């Protein structure tokens, strides 16, 4: 992914084809991993298959070892000691990770907050200086366009998967494998795909519209899966009660199912907003990296994260880089706090 990000901007001919092939291999690798996980989860792979190839991989009969293993000689005192040791190890690991995260947050805020000012946020960005005002406008434009496309598609796709399709159908498994695979693909691969399709094929050029369409591809899998999991968690008795009272399938979905799953849909939207605001790799080659205000969706525009990358790459705007990072960090903290509050407010007990 690093090679794709660094070299795709100027690659041509065989060099560019090799980078595209690298992204394709990465996509196939992630897809293969998800297929294996689904087979294991669905008990399609068992230990008998593994033991049948033990001569190749030097794996002994796992089932036999498990069956012969016994806890009868383990004393309760030793179990208690091991449990205490595990508890303190877990506490220590939690403290270390929390302190490390807190150090990063405080370091960025201390370095960046003093340099956040009106001129940085709303000043004119030109050849002599760079400000965040074009990034604010570009990010807002991409947020609006990507969410207005991705949310309806994602929600209605989840409705189809949970309400109309067969629960254990092969098509459903295939769709879930592909959505999970897309969720695990690095964003630079989406950026490469967006550049090939929206820029080269459709001729949009590096524009806010091309970046927005690329963001749709990035956030759509998470919206589908989050909404689907929410709708699956709704008890079937609510649907059956509505249908028993004479309500149609469509009315049951819009009056019973969606209101009950509203908190999950909002969660998916908020997480998508955080992903969009912090996205950079996929947008460098689709929406562009410019310091000017976009005149419309067909013009190039830089998001917050791309503008931070531009600040750092210039070498003259280190303070502005930390200021932008502080703003992004505060946005993420605010979104997570909002998510926590809304989950507590909108959570339903069935």
Tell me what each language-model feature is.
Residues 36-96, 339-350:
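Transmembrane alpha-helical segments of polytopic membrane transport and secretion proteins
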Residues 179-216:
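Generic hydrophobic transmembrane alpha-helix motif, especially the helices
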Residues 29, 33, 137, 141-149, ...:
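Hydrophobic alpha-helical transmembrane segments of multipass integral membrane proteins
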